[in-house]
């Protein structure tokens, strides 16, 4: 029984892994990796869906697509960034994920202190 459950779980994981790797289909075309499908629904008439790159630092962004997997104006953020409310009137923008920038600053600070200690030892 445990063996059957383990096999079923493994198959389920494989199915989900395959779904994530499939490229996004947008307006009859497949989008490249690190892109999403956007269809501007504002203004006169609807634009046809188009592939857009994922958001970069400070780019406008969206968090959730519609029921068809299409975003209304902007892609979500790329890797290492999160879609965060910024400024007035709380527009969503891609920002560094919290903790990442702090960690990099901390590691830079520790490197600098090690270097300065090393230079003191060599001069003394």
Swiss-Prot record:
Annotated Gene3D superfamilies: Lipase, subunit A
Paired cysteines (S-S): 26-37, 31-51, 36-75, 61-83, 77-94
Tissue expression: Expressed by the venom gland.
Gene Ontology CC: extracellular region
The keyword Signal belongs to this UniProt entry's keyword annotation: yes
Sorted UniProt keywords: Disulfide bond, Ion channel impairing toxin, Secreted, Signal, Toxin
Keyword NAD included in the entry's annotation: no
Region (Disordered): 93-124
Subcellular location: Secreted
GO molecular function annotations of the record: ion channel regulator activity; toxin activity
Signal peptide start and end residues: 1-17
Domain of life of the organism encoding this protein: Eukaryota
Transmembrane region(s): none
Biased composition, class Basic and acidic residues, residue ranges: 93-108
Family of this protein: Belongs to the neurotoxin 32 family.
General function of this protein: Probable ion channel inhibitor.
Name by which UniProt lists this protein: U33-theraphotoxin-Cg1b
């Amino acid at each position: 029984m445990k063996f059957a459950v383990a096999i079923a779980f493994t198959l389920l994981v494989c199915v989900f892994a395959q779904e994530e790797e499939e490229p996004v289909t947008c307006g009859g075309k497949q989008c490249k990796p690190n892109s999403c499908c956007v269809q501007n629904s504002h203004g006169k008439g609807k634009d046809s869906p188009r592939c857009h790159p994922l958001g970069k630092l400070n780019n406008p962004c969206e968090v959730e697509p519609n029921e068809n997997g299409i975003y209304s104006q902007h892609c979500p953020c790329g890797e290492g960034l999160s879609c965060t409310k910024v400024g007035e009137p709380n527009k969503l923008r891609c920002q560094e994920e919290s903790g990442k920038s702090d960690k990099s600053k901390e590691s830079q600070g520790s490197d600098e202190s090690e270097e300065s200690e090393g230079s003191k030892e060599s001069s003394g």
